[in-house]
Amino acid sequence: MKDDNLYGEGWCWDDDNPVLSPLLVSRKDAFVGRFVDMLREAGIVVDASLGEARKPSDAFCICHRFHTMDQVLLRMLKDSDNLYAEAMFYQLAASSGNRPATAKDARSVVRHLVTKLGLRADGYAFADGSGLSLYNYVSAELEMAMLKYAYRNNNIMLHLRPSLPIAATDGTLRHRMSGPFTNGNVVAKTGTLTGISSLAGYCKSANGHDLAFVILNQGLRHTRNGRAFQDKVCQELCRP
């Protein structure tokens, strides 16, 4: 489904690019070697050249393994797993119907959503799926629009809310916001780059209203300062 590019897009020439081959084993591009080793251990000898290529038209499926969207979302959001985020990015690309799925296709899908939200897609840049690329450019306005769009669509929230980290409970918020107003009352996605920290999600106010929020802290010398600020904002949003 994905293109045969070994690496993703959106990286500088001197970056340590993560491998994004569709056939990863323990996050390493070692599927073919591992597969052959297991065949040998089972007493099966393969007398042929081995490698990765397009499936022949006369090939047939022996075993089919897949993960549900919820399984991917849970790992991607709760644990902030960048590999899973890239996998979701190319899943978006596949939804366009193009084969093989490319980063360009994924960006097209995202831009279509931005336009649907009433914003100008050419005002933003989407380089990768994980958000690690320095070539990404988004705003709090865009993230808020997406949060509101998701909230108003139950078929999205049904999958999104259970996948977000919960304050003082699990995921990347497990050790944050343990106070009486925020504990279990904030669900949000964290984001961290050098000098940057962000938090975006939902919380419930004292009157029972659901609130969406987006906090982007930039120019930080210490990430903990940004996180402390975010936690305090959430505390005030939830305070009676």
Range-by-range predicted roles:
Residues 1-154, 158:
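A small/polar active-site loop signature that marks catalytic segments
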Residues 89-240:
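Small-residue-rich helix-loop
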